[in-house]
Amino acid sequence: RIVAESAKMDLNLDSVVGDGDPIDICVLSEREIYHAGILIKCIPIGVIRMIDKGEIDDKIIAVIEGDQVYGEYRDINDCPKTVLDRIQHYLLTYKDLPGSLKPNAVISSVDGADVAKKIIKLSMQDYIESFPEHHKEYESSVAAVESLGR
């Protein structure tokens, strides 16, 4: 809820709502990640702000700390244009059915690490509003987000 309201203000959009997801993260790595349900220490470097079927669907872009290929990136501007173009193409098309002519999603902006960290913090606020019993974890997580990429 908080993330969606912030995006509506940031992007000057009145007619969109949040997609209900806690947060979406695309992790760049030289290594394959074979399954979900694992924890990886990542550094957010940017965000691709998207509207998908009228819903805000931001994608945080992050790198694995210490990754041999991407680990030195600290901002989306550190990505080569070809890498960023491929990520954007994937995010715009991965939900499309074969033969579909109308795209489901549009990219409204591509922003750097500062905006990504702001969105992460807002998502954490959304979480704590939904699960107030986890307030202590929230406080330590905010401090961890503040220190990322330093």
Where are the regions that the model predicts?
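Hydrophobic N-terminal alpha-helices or hydrophobic patches in metabolic proteins across all domains
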Residues: R1-R150
